[in-house]
From Swiss-Prot:
UniProt catalytic activity: (S)-2,3,4,5-tetrahydrodipicolinate + NAD(+) + H2O = (2S,4S)-4-hydroxy-2,3,4,5-tetrahydrodipicolinate + NADH + H(+); (S)-2,3,4,5-tetrahydrodipicolinate + NADP(+) + H2O = (2S,4S)-4-hydroxy-2,3,4,5-tetrahydrodipicolinate + NADPH + H(+)
Taxonomic source organism: Chlorobium phaeovibrioides (strain DSM 265 / 1930) (Prosthecochloris vibrioformis (strain DSM 265))
Leading EC class: oxidoreductase
Alphabetical keyword list: Amino-acid biosynthesis, Cytoplasm, Diaminopimelate biosynthesis, Lysine biosynthesis, NAD, NADP, Oxidoreductase
Protein name in UniProt: 4-hydroxy-tetrahydrodipicolinate reductase
Gene transcribed to yield this protein: dapB
Length: 248
C-alpha cells in the first residue's frame, strides 16, 4: 500500500519509520505545515494517515475527504465537533477512522476498563477515578486517551455522570463526578491509570507506553483495514470497529 502522511512531527516520523521498515508498504508523500492541501495531492495513495493538530486537521478535512482516499487520524482536540465531522464524512461518501490512541495495548486496556466499570457498577462501596501522565510538551489535557477512558467508564457505570477535570476550589466532588487528573512530567510517553477504591480493596488498571512505535504500528494496521473496506463500506469508524472485526 501507498500512504500519504499529513504531519511531519514526532508521530509522523514514527509512522514513516514503520512504513519504511515494511516490505509491502511505501510512502507516496509527506505533507508538512507548509504544504498546500488539495484533494489532488492525495490521489494515487491508498490511505492517508494524519497526525497534526486540531486546527490543521479541521482545515484539511474537506480536501482529504474529497480525495476519495480513506483517512486515518490520530489528531485530538476536536471531540466536540464529532457529529459535524461525521456529517461531512457521510456527505462525501468517505471513510475516516479516528482514535486518540492506536496502541493495541491501550485498546486492550480500554476494553478491560469497560468490563471492570460494569462489574463494580452495582456496588456503591467502589469508587473510580482516572489519572494520566504525559511529557511536558503535550498541549491538551486531559489527553484524548484519558477522555476516551472516562467515556468508557461513564457508559458502563451509571453511578458516574460527568467528567471533572479540576478539583473544586471549595467543597468536594459529588458522588457522581468522575475525576480525570492530569500530570505533565519530563519525557513520559503516556501512562493512563484507573483507580477503583473501597474501604477493603484497591484495584489499579494501568497502561504505560514505552515508545511511540506502538501508536504508529497500530495506525498503519488500522489504515490497511480501512482501505480494505473502502469504498464499498464508507463511514466513520473507531478502533473498536477495527478490533471487533479482528476478534469476531
Amino acid at each position: 500500500m501507498k500512504f500519504t502522511l499529513v504531519g511531519n512531527g514526532r508521530m509522523g516520523h514514527e509512522v514513516a519509520s514503520v512504513i519504511d521498515a515494511s516490505t509491502v508498504h511505501s510512502i507516496a508523500a509527506v505533507l508538512d505545515i507548509d504544504a498546500v492541501i488539495t484533494p489532488e495531492v492525495f490521489r494515487g495513495s491508498d490511505a492517508i494517515i494524519d497526525f497534526t493538530v486540531r486546527d490543521a486537521f479541521l482545515e484539511n478535512l474537506d480536501a482529504m475527504l474529497a480525495s476519495g482516499v480513506p483517512v486515518v487520524t490520530g489528531t485530538t482536540g476536536w471531540d466536540g465537533l464529532r457529529e459535524e465531522v461525521a456529517v461531512k464524512v457521510s456527505e462525501a461518501g468517505a471513510s475516516l477512522l479516528y482514535s486518540a490512541n492506536f496502541s493495541l495495548g491501550v485498546n486492550v486496556f480500554l476494553r478491560t476498563l469497560r468490563e471492570a466499570s460494569r462489574l463494580i457498577a452495582p456496588f456503591a462501596q467502589f469508587d473510580i477515578a482516572m489519572e494520566e501522565h504525559h511529557h511536558t510538551g503535550k498541549v491538551d489535557f486531559p489527553s484524548g486517551t484519558a477522555l476516551a477512558a472516562a467515556n468508557v467508564i461513564l457508559s458502563a457505570n451509571s453511578r458516574k455522570q460527568r467528567i471533572v477535570r479540576e478539583l473544586p476550589e471549595a467543597g468536594r466532588l459529588a458522588p457522581d463526578d468522575l475525576q480525570v487528573a492530569s500530570v505533565r512530567l519530563g519525557s513520559v510517553f503516556g501512562k493512563h491509570s484507573a483507580f477503583i477504591d473501597s474501604e477493603a480493596d484497591e484495584i489499579v488498571l494501568s497502561h504505560t507506553a514505552k515508545s511511540r512505535s506502538g501508536f504508529a504500528s497500530g495506525a498503519v494496521e488500522a489504515a490497511v483495514w480501512l482501505a480494505g473496506r473502502h469504498p464499498k463500506q464508507p463511514g466513520m469508524y473507531s478502533m473498536d470497529d477495527f478490533l471487533n472485526e479482528l476478534l469476531g
